[in-house]
Amino acid sequence: MLIKNYRTQFVQALASIFDEKEIESFFYIILEAFHQLKRVDLVLSPDLKLDNIQLLQWETVLLQLKEQKPIQYILGETQFFGLPFYVNENTLIPRPETEELVEWIIKENLKISSLKNLKILDIGTGSGCIAISLAKNLPNASVFAIDVSDKALATAQKNAVLNEVDITFIEKNILQTEDLNQEFDIIVSNPPYVRNLEKKEIHKNVLEYEPHLALFVEDNDSLLFYRKITELATRNLSNNGQLYFEINQYLGKETVELLEKYNFKNTTLKKDIYGNDRMIKVNFR
C-alpha cells in the first residue's frame, strides 16, 4: 500500500477522537520513527510503499491511539529541549512548559557556570529531563537528581547514558527527608501539583496512562511538596542559592506567599507560553 493512501485511512480512523492537526502530528511522528522520513520526503517521493510488516506496525500503533494511549508511550520515546528521551508509564511525558523552566535556568546561570562549578539538584526527576538538559547545557555543573520511584530512576539513568551526561541519581522520598546533607547552588523541582478537583479538566490520555504519583496531590494540602522542598532549601541552599519551581497555574499567589513565609527574596513569578502562571524563582539570603 502507498503511504499516502494509508494516510487517508489513518486520518479517518482517528477523526472522531482527535482534531486534524493532532492526527497529522501523530502521522508524521510515526513516519519518522518507523521510516526515518520527514513530511518533505513524502512530498518528494509520493510512491513510497508500506510492506505487510510495516503495515502491521502502523495498525498496531493505530489501535493504541484509538484507546488514547499517548504516542510517546506507544513509541517509548520523545524529545525534550532538543534531546531524545525514553519514556514509559513510570515517567511523566515532558511538557513544553517544563522546557521553558529549563531555558530560564540556563539563561540565568550560563555565565556563572563558566566561572564556577555549580551544584544543581532536581527533586522528583522522573525521566530525568530537567537534570539531563541542565547537565547538557551547563557542562561545568555537578547535577544530582532525586526520585521516590526506582522504576522512574532506571529510565532516567538510561536517558543520562543516551545523552552522554553524568548525573548522580538518588532514590529518596523527599517528604520523609529532613536534610539533604550537602549544599546546592540551585534546587529545581516540578513536583506533583494537580489537585484531585482538577481531574475533570484532565484528558483521558493523561488520566489513564500517566503515573498519578507524579501528578496529583490532595485538595486539602495542595502545596505539600512545595512546603517540604522549601523547608529543605532553607537548610541546603548555598548563600545566594536559587530555588526554581514549576507550579500549578491556579496557585501562583499561594505559592509566592508560601515562599515569602520562609523569607526567600527576589521572588519572580513567570507565565508560560499559554499565559498561565507556571514557574517561580527565588533567591536564598
Curated annotation (Swiss-Prot):
Enzyme class: transferase
InterPro entries per record: DNA_methylase_N6_adenine_CS, HemK-like, N5-glutamine_MTase, PrmC_N, RF_methyltr_PrmC, SAM-dependent_MTases_sf, Small_mtfrase_dom
UniProt-annotated binding residues for substrate: 190-193
Enzyme nomenclature, EC number: 2.1.1.297
Record's catalysed reaction(s): L-glutaminyl-[peptide chain release factor] + S-adenosyl-L-methionine = N(5)-methyl-L-glutaminyl-[peptide chain release factor] + S-adenosyl-L-homocysteine + H(+)
Similarity remark: Belongs to the protein N5-glutamine methyltransferase family. PrmC subfamily.
Protein name, UniProt field: Release factor glutamine methyltransferase
Gene this protein is translated from: prmC
